[in-house]
Amino acid sequence: MNNARPIHRALLSVSDKTGIVEFAKALAERGVELLSTGGTARLLAEQGLTVTEVSDYTGFPEMMDGRVKTLHPKVHGGILGRRGQDDAVMNTHGIQPIDMVVVNLYPFAQTVANPNCTLADAVENIDIGGPTMVRSAAKNHKDVAIVVNAHDYDRVIREMDANHNSLTLATRFDLAIAAFEHTAAYDGMIANYFGTLVPSYGDNKEGDEESKFPRTFNAQFIKKQDMRYGENSHQAAAFYVEANPQEASVATARQIQGKALSYNNIADTDAALECVKEFSEPACVIVKHANPCGVALGDDLLQAYNRAYQTDPTSAFGGIIAFNRELDGETARAIIERQFVEVIIAPKVSQAAIDIVAAKQNVRLLECGEWQGQTTGFDLKRVNGGLLVQDRDQGMVAQDDLQVVSTRQPSDAELKDALFCWKVAKYVKSNAIVYAKGDMTIGIGAGQMSRVYSAKIAGIKAADEGLEVAGSVMASDAFFPFRDGIDAAAEAGITCVIQPGGSMRDQEVIDAANEHGMAMIFTGMRHFRH
């Protein structure tokens, strides 16, 4: 049995009125009696629907500027009453069963997002009656349907039509889960907002400013897919996304073809896409194990790809390729004919490219949409027993921010390459060293415990691929603690170094650059990446 329950009476009270008129009309056409409150009732009545105001049903008026509307036994008794068990009590008190509750909540998130929002504004947008009805209906899903999302309206009507105006228990249970998720997210937003208005635990000094981070951290993500396994085959995994991601990303991407994305695919694709977003010129980023192994600019995507691949063809095998322009057929053909690739992602993919990549059905081809800058937010990192939370690293220097600390000034070409490889270094695991020349990476040294060894690896990789390091620019994601890194760079033929500065031995490092006739640029900004 599907334990279907017929829908005879529905209570509608929504802040977001998207689709509510059409939904209410569909319910009315199917003989459902409509109860409603406030603005929702007025809207439905204006559209010619017969609606009973909740205040008329309860015999108790709305009061306190609408703060008290539905908090009444005739409402909650009708929702919570167990059919076949509480019928006598309901009849004694004149409580009619309510079979469906359609509620969404005051727009708290939109209210507090307004920079001019006051505490009083926030308080008045904390919904009380709405969450109470939602939770009541979800608790009694055995008998009552709760609808909190407008995108479920059509689904509900279709099922009613297929089941003689009834909804199955499976559907009511699914709607109840969505309802509890809805109220959990809502309460989490409120707790986060109020939690930022006071100092964090342990910092209760008088006069402390508001905290950027709430006392408790509440976040909600929606499962997009289950995975075969996680980072390793013995780990279970799933991919969760924000409810409404605002920025084009791997989370918003549409998969055009290919096998299901793996855990590592998603992590690597994110690294590649976020790096390529840094560039305004046609760019290609190739990533392996979350590190760029080749990055280049070009007059078009084909040139950018060819140059990025040239940096490290060995590591590019089985890599992730990201572009910041529409993927064209010529570039797609060059990739497919040249190398094995796991994922290709671009803001848009041409039909010609789709047709070409289709020859390799296992290649995952993603279209993420155009991006308009970066959205603010937090980066999260799990540690045993805790969670590290920080701002996203959206910092990036412009030419005017740079400080030349060497005797020799960088040439225009060196300056351009310095800014290019500084952007790349931001996305390389620390300790990060990037060699670049002519808008392409020459060698990349990543993830070494010693900065000097990262530099050596960058040089070895360049030599292995027959690339000339002499005349290149070197970027370091953090300062040089000793001059040995500069001496090694000079020996390799590096002519310009860009780094944050800030070491106690900065002068020693600058002196080394001057001795070798190198230009040295300080950014004043570090880009550790762990």
Curated annotation (Swiss-Prot):
SUPFAM superfamilies named in the record: Cytidine deaminase-like, Methylglyoxal synthase-like
Coiled coil (UniProt feature): none
Keyword Electron transport listed: no
Gene Ontology molecular function, alphabetical: IMP cyclohydrolase activity; phosphoribosylaminoimidazolecarboxamide formyltransferase activity
InterPro entries: AICAR_Tfase_dup_dom_sf, Cytidine_deaminase-like, MGS-like_dom, MGS-like_dom_sf, PurH-like
One CC-aspect GO term: cytosol
Chemical reaction(s) catalysed: (6R)-10-formyltetrahydrofolate + 5-amino-1-(5-phospho-beta-D-ribosyl)imidazole-4-carboxamide = 5-formamido-1-(5-phospho-D-ribosyl)imidazole-4-carboxamide + (6S)-5,6,7,8-tetrahydrofolate; IMP + H2O = 5-formamido-1-(5-phospho-D-ribosyl)imidazole-4-carboxamide
Lineage: superkingdom: Bacteria
UniProt cross-references to CDD domains, sorted A to Z: IMPCH
EC identifiers of the protein: 2.1.2.3, 3.5.4.10
Limits of the MGS-like domain: 1-148
Keywords assigned by UniProt, alphabetized: Hydrolase, Multifunctional enzyme, Purine biosynthesis, Transferase
Pathway: Purine metabolism; IMP biosynthesis via de novo pathway; 5-formamido-1-(5-phospho-D-ribosyl)imidazole-4-carboxamide from 5-amino-1-(5-phospho-D-ribosyl)imidazole-4-carboxamide (10-formyl THF route): step 1/1; Purine metabolism; IMP biosynthesis via de novo pathway; IMP from 5-formamido-1-(5-phospho-D-ribosyl)imidazole-4-carboxamide: step 1/1
GO biological process, one term: 'de novo' IMP biosynthetic process
Stated family: Belongs to the PurH family.
Domain statement: The IMP cyclohydrolase activity resides in the N-terminal region.
HAMAP family for the chain: PurH
PANTHER family: BIFUNCTIONAL PURINE BIOSYNTHESIS PROTEIN ATIC (PTHR11692:SF0), BIFUNCTIONAL PURINE BIOSYNTHESIS PROTEIN PURH (PTHR11692)
Protein name stated in the entry: Bifunctional purine biosynthesis protein PurH
Organism: Vibrio cholerae serotype O1 (strain ATCC 39315 / El Tor Inaba N16961)
Gene: purH
